[in-house]
């Protein structure tokens, strides 16, 4: 989701920037 820290996203926890 383009975030730079671990956050609850649609795919789950994403501890890295995602686009």
Curated annotation (Swiss-Prot):
GO terms for biological process, alphabetical = neuropeptide signaling pathway
| Record's keyword terms, sorted | Amidation, Neuropeptide, Secreted
Compartment(s) of residence: Secreted
Q: Which residues carry this modification: Valine amide?
A: 19
Is Protein biosynthesis a UniProt keyword of this protein? no
A GO cellular component annotation in the UniProt record: extracellular region
Q: What does this protein do?
A: Mediates visceral muscle contractile activity (myotropic activity).
Member of which family? Answer: Belongs to the periviscerokinin family.
Q: Per its record, how is this protein called by name?
A: CAPA-Periviscerokinin-2
